[in-house]
């Protein structure tokens, strides 16, 4: 579950999270990811993820995202708290041009670039973890749109099976 920020830039959420303003727009996402490769003696995995999201509050539409990228697993405290960090990159398709993106950016498109950064923590031998994710849609510096996009901070749960 995430809440959409009114911050213009994703890095504003990372550098000053306590000063972030949020709009009354939320995002609920269900995702399936699959690891397809491991490197560096298992320290890095590569995964692909598909997401179905529903935006509600000040906007109401569905969002479909597909992304792939690396996940880092080698943290020195993993014996106490299993930790991983991921960066995934792909595409995001909204079922309509998001109203909040229009309000915040002046324009947007249904199809935009999608990326996320995630940190997940859980018990050392457990198959579940809690995740904190920055969910980002953007025009990709004019590749898909000159304006548009959004940032959402999301808290979630991951289950391995």
Q: What function would you assign to each model-found segment?
A:
Residues 1-34, 158:
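Short glycine/proline- and aromatic-enriched beta-strand/turn motifs that initiate or cap beta-hairpins
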Residues 27, 34-41, 46-148, 158-161:
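Outer-membrane beta-barrel transmembrane domain signature
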């Amino acid at each position: 579950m995430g809440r959409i920020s009114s911050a213009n830039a994703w890095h504003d959420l990372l550098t000053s999270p306590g000063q972030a303003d949020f709009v009354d727009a939320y995002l609920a996402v269900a995702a399936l990811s699959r690891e397809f490769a491991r490197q560096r003696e298992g320290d890095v995995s590569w995964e692909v993820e598909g997401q179905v999201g529903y935006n509600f509050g000040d906007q109401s539409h569905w969002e479909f995202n597909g992304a792939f990228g690396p996940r880092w697993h080698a943290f020195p405290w993993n014996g106490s708290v299993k930790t991983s960090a991921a960066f995934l990159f792909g595409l995001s398709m909204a079922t309509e041009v998001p109203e909040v993106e229009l309000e915040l950016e002046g324009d947007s498109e249904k199809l935009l670039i999608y990326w996320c950064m995630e940190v997940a923590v859980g018990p050392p031998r457990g198959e579940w973890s809690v995740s904190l994710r920055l969910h980002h849609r953007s025009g990709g510096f004019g590749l898909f749109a000159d304006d548009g996009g959004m940032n959402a901070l999301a808290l979630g749960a991951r289950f391995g099976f």
